[in-house]
Amino acid sequence: MRELTLQAQPYQGERHEKAWGHELWIINNNLYCGKLLVFKKGKQFSMHFHLLKDEAWYISKGEFTYKWIDTETATEHETHVKEGDCIHLMPGQPHQMLALTEGATIFEVSTQHFDYDSYRVKPGASQV
């Protein structure tokens, strides 16, 4: 019987600078994507949605105002989220995060990330 050996070597994540902070991409392949989103206090990314991406967030540090649009009623909502909270975003769900604390961090697990799969509804720090 042949023995299977896996050689998992440590590596550095891929850092992507943003006006609101930065993303640290841990992995992005055809099965899944894992990222850390680290925010500057008072900054937010755009209100946007994805048609392909299904994402789940874990607030690992700090506090945010989480904003989303109910697409059936066209109503915008917002709520306070903090360390330990989780959010699941289905494809097509417009969403936005505003950091209330410096270094506020989200651990994101999702289906594969594609740059062309972000549709902006309102600008964020990177668009102004």
Please annotate each region the language model reported:
Residues M1-K35, Q44-S46, E78-T79, V121-V128:
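A short, N-terminal "cap"/entry segment at the start of jelly-roll beta-barrel domains
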Residues L52-T71:
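Glycine- and acidic-residue-biased ligand/ion/polar-headgroup-sensing regions
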Residues D70-G92:
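Short acidic-glycine-tyrosine-enriched beta hairpin
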Residues S46-H48, Y66-W68, I87-L89, P94-L100, ...:
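Short beta-strand His + acidic residue motifs that chelate non-heme Fe in jelly-roll/DSBH
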